[in-house]
Amino acid sequence: MIICNVSRRSVSASPRFKETERPRPPMNATADCQTTTVDPHRPRYAVYAMPAGEFADAGAAWLGWDARAGRQVAQPHLPGLPRPLSQLALRAGRYGFHATIKAPMALAGDCGYDDLRDQLRDLCGRLHPVEVTLELRDDLNFLAFRPAGGTGDLQDLAATVVRDLDPLRAELTEREITRRNPGALTPRQQGLLVQFGYPYALEEFNLHVTLTEQLADDERRIVRGVAEDFFAAKVPAPWRIDELCILAADAQGRFHLRDCCPLKG
């Protein structure tokens, strides 16, 4: 139960959004990587599904940041890459190796971290673990692990978390809305941005474990081949998501693990 005091906001789409003639396709993985400055007076928290074991270790090495341990990791020199990993995964590395369930947010009213943790812990006690078969994809101009098959259970889990935690979320500032480039979103995505602070929620949700920035076609093909070799035999089949984790952004915008809540339903 939410115990902090928050004022409820309207969930209707804002009239300031103007639809472009041809909205661009969803780029939800890169949308997580658009923060350029961090306001120390508005701590940001996110709820992630985080890989474990050698898959997580490989991902931390690729990105150069271990969000579980809260430390930088030496990125390997991988022959064949067109650029160093430090450039290919520059912004993605801030967030760690993860799949977003509830996008980074500030907390509303007098809500504090304990309220978020307790609410997620209670929620996870009622949610079931889910299994996802992953494949390496590059069809949205960046490289990411994404589901290879049906995701109905995963969609339900993510939607439940987004809805149940949203009363804790502070309303987006004008600057945050502008950063999302709402003119490039579909009308439905604009509505979700206003309602949940993120345009790729509910039916627009698409799980992704991001590896790179957006890349040109020729680079993307090369990097994909190198990544396939690097992650070979390290990707769980399937990936069992049996806990959800809260991460907090530091003053540099890097995310650190705070708590993990097991799915016990």
What spans do the regions from the language model cover?
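Small/polar glycine-rich anion-binding or flexible loop at a beta-alpha turn
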Residues: 240-248
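Basic, often amphipathic N-terminal segments
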Residues: 28-139, 152, 156-238, 251-265
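Low-acidity, Ser/Thr- and Arg-rich intrinsically disordered low-complexity segments
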Residues: 4-16, 22-24
